[in-house]
Amino acid sequence: MLDILLTNIGQLLTMDQEDGVLRQEAMKTLPVIESGAVGIKDGVIMFVGTAEEAKGLQAREIIDCEGKVVSPGLVDPHTHLVFGGSRENEIALKLQGVPYLEILEQGGGILSTVNATKKASKEELVKKANFHLDRMLSFGVTTVEAKSGYGLDDETEWKQLEVVAQLQKEHPIDLVSTFLGAHAVPKEYKGKSKEFLQWMLDLLPAIKEKELAEFVDIFCETGVFSVEESKEFLLEAKELGFDVKIHADEIDPLGGAEAAAEIGAASADHLVGASDKGIEMLANSNTVATLLPGTTFYLNKESFARGRKMIDEGVAVALATDFNPGSCPTENIQLVMSIAMLKLKMTPEEVWNAVTVNSAYAINRGDVAGKIRVGRKADLVLWDAHHYAYVPYHYGVSHVNTVWKNGNLAYTRGDKAWSKATI
């Protein structure tokens, strides 16, 4: 006896093809069962097939999906979830053409968020991040990577990681924690980046002991941390047992993509300025390219990451929101899917694979998230759409009808009681 049987599914997107990251033709392929059904028991998927094949199955609850699309829960592999305050006051300055460095000198930019995060209590940060997670869930996301990075000191970075750990216990969404202490160089360490990185490295053994982070990340960019500094820092983190990621080539082609491939990073993120050589090296590596077109869009930049070229050359591409208060204040991964289709020239099939299978592998969750397969946990989304391409095509709104997390009802459109969180 099943707990739940979803039937009369118009298109069941299983995403279940080869194991491992998807590249080239595999990214263009979307496994779809027309007129499908999914059976769930004890939070686990027990049946995947056609509605006709499911006719003999017994279930405590049978849900008629009315010919709509069902997919795996989406995976957002790059967010800056935990932070204090907001920065809407900077919009007018940006529109007036005030340079970012001048905004920084006025106490704005990342320094504003760092100060607000330092001042906020752990309880305040939990409440705020919970609000944002609820929104992510409403957009169909069931697994999220969450970074620290708005402390730039030991106490606040630790506080952010503890917030993620608490939310992992309390919120339906699965969280994957990343230590991004090397997000920027604080004023007091100006010209002394190596000393600052050593301070951050000194925190890692305790973070590892308390299991507060699975990944270590660094911002490799002009004026922040060099390629050599980034490689050395991440290799030392790997020696301590962490997997690593890198904010790479967001603005300039510094060689961050090449560095990620060389050191075996789980992902290289941003990559707007990635060189041809960097793309080639990523294609010949196991590193996932996590592209963040929502950030480029919000910053009103003309040049987007070369997603089309990356896919054609064999890079495993994932998509993420880069949710953060400065350069991409949105939890809407569906909007990111639309931007990727229009600006990165990705097909609807590639976009879907990039927010499920490949995004799961970008955070070492490829064996548990991003696919609908017998034996896996039942993270499922019912969409108010009768064709999968409709979701990125009709942009700017949420098409989610219902979300199940581990087989439990986690969100239903129109249920005003589903979220008690406030910002």
Curated annotation (Swiss-Prot):
Any one cellular-component term (Gene Ontology): cytoplasm
Note accompanying the cofactor annotation: Binds 1 zinc or iron ion per subunit.
Q: Which residues bind Zn(2+)?
A: 78, 80, 247, 322
The domain of life is Bacteria
According to the UniProt entry, the coiled-coil residues are none
Instruction: Cite the binding residues for N-formimidoyl-L-glutamate.
Output: 150, 324, 326
Q: Which InterPro entries match?
A: Amidohydro-rel, HutI, Metal-dep_hydrolase_composite, Metal_Hydrolase
State any single GO MF term. imidazolonepropionase activity
Annotated 4-imidazolone-5-propanoate binding lies at 87, 150, 183, 250, 327
Pathway, according to UniProt?
Amino-acid degradation; L-histidine degradation into L-glutamate; N-formimidoyl-L-glutamate from L-histidine: step 3/3
- Catalytic reaction(s) noted: 4-imidazolone-5-propanoate + H2O = N-formimidoyl-L-glutamate
Q: Subcellular location, in the record's words?
A: Cytoplasm
What this protein needs as a cofactor is: Zn(2+); Fe(3+)
Q: Which cysteines are joined by disulfide bonds?
A: none
Q: Which residues bind Fe(3+)?
A: 78, 80, 247, 322
Q: Which UniProt keywords apply?
A: Cytoplasm, Histidine metabolism, Hydrolase, Iron, Metal-binding, Zinc
Q: What is its EC number?
A: 3.5.2.7
Any one of the GO BP annotations: L-histidine catabolic process to glutamate and formate
The record's annotation in NCBIfam families points to: hutI (TIGR01224)
Query: What biological function has been recorded for the protein in this entry?
Result: Catalyzes the hydrolytic cleavage of the carbon-nitrogen bond in imidazolone-5-propanoate to yield N-formimidoyl-L-glutamate. It is the third step in the universal histidine degradation pathway.
What HAMAP family does the entry give? HutI
- Family statement drawn from the similarity comment of this UniProt entry: Belongs to the metallo-dependent hydrolases superfamily. HutI family.
What is the name attached to this protein's record? Answer: Imidazolonepropionase
Q: Please give the organism.
A: Bacillus cytotoxicus (strain DSM 22905 / CIP 110041 / 391-98 / NVH 391-98)
Q: Which gene encodes it?
A: hutI
